[in-house]
């Protein structure tokens, strides 16, 4: 076999192996699931089981998915930029073992969730607007003295996450259809 044919065949073999590894990693990591809005993508990592289980048993389970609360709404570009940035940060943290096992929301994540709480509840509930008090000033961009919704509404939607971390199988979260 001459040298040029050997290089072509060798290159094809290396490319095929690299492609096979790439396909395997995409499949093993369930990478395509992260492009969806399916809340089950959030439990690809066992660390999120308590958050998924508490959301699943909350009033929000029938009305809002994880991405509707945790990612920007309205602008698809911003949504996927945030999703990619968060995914990259999570991947690096889990790969290097530098993540906080108690899973605390980031400052940017808290801002997005707060904006989505206000957006969803301000548009859905005229009662809250009519009876607005100092804690529910939805029309004020700073809100009620910059309080976060979950400071008062502690059980929405994740409830007592810490108590679920010790629950065997986290309420059967893996069997959810």
UniProtKB/Swiss-Prot annotation:
Positions with a binding annotation for substrate: 79, 86
Cytoplasmic side of membrane: 1-5
Main location: membrane
Oligomeric and partner information: Heterodimer with NrfA.
GO MF annotations, alphabetized: electron transfer activity; heme binding; metal ion binding
Alphabetically ordered keywords of this record: Cell inner membrane, Cell membrane, Electron transport, Heme, Iron, Membrane, Metal-binding, Transmembrane, Transmembrane helix, Transport
Membrane in keyword set: yes
GO process annotations (BP): anaerobic respiration; denitrification pathway; electron transport chain
Protein modification: Binds 4 heme groups per subunit.
Name assigned to this protein: Cytochrome c-type protein NrfH
Cross-referenced Gene3D superfamilies: Di-heme elbow motif domain
């Amino acid at each position: 076999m001459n040298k040029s044919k050997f290089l072509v065949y060798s290159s094809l073999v290396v490319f095929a192996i690299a492609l096979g590894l790439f396909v395997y990693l995409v499949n093993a990591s369930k990478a395509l699931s992260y492009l969806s809005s399916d809340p089950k993508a959030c439990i690809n990592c066992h660390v999120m089981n308590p958050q998924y289980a508490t959301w699943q048993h909350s009033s929000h389970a029938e009305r809002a998915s994880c991405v509707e609360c945790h990612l920007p709404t309205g602008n698809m570009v911003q949504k996927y930029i945030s999703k990619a940035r968060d995914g990259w940060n999570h991947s690096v943290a889990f790969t290097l073992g530098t993540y906080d096992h108690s899973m605390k929301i980031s400052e940017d994540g808290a801002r997005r969730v707060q904006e989505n709480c206000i957006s969803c509840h301000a548009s859905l509930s005229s009662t809250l607007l009519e009876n607005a008090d100092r804690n529910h000033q939805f029309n004020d961009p700073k809100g009620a003295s910059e309080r976060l919704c979950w400071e008062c509404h502690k059980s929405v939607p994740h409830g007592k996450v810490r108590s679920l971390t010790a629950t065997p199988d986290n309420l059967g979260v893996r069997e959810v259809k």
